[in-house]
């Protein structure tokens, strides 16, 4: 919801401004609930579905930045750093059978947004130390979607699209001549190609996959 509020605030059309004004009170409530909840959240939720903490923080940060809500931005940033800064040598036990988020890559994308460039590069080297040799392999191979009419299995197309988004964003951590940038962008392209053609065609995916496709493409 906060991501929707952020997108509406970015648009200059009269319709967007009207919708943004209508949504603003609810966005403020969500912001306050984040501020109330984050101090209680001792541990992050690392699953590959709706409850993933890194995903929530990443989207909420968009709103905090666009709305100049420095209190929310600081709370989100400090919590993400506290949860994830000591994570090293990620094993990436994924995908799960109904994942639509990569726990590993979503964490890496979240940390990209809360650390400075130098600090993030150091953190990422520790978190994915074998990225230069495309390991863990599971992060580089698109998930197999065996039955797109199954609501849970169809989630895996979302996983491929969200991985494409994360890989493309993570690639920004390195200069253009760094081989790891090429590796990350290649992984993004591979995942996008695997699932973008299936955004439509089966209801179990087509009523939501377009949102993930937009993240992967924009």
Language model regions located:
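Eukaryote-skewed repeat-based solenoidal scaffolds used as protein-protein interaction platforms
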Residues: 2-135
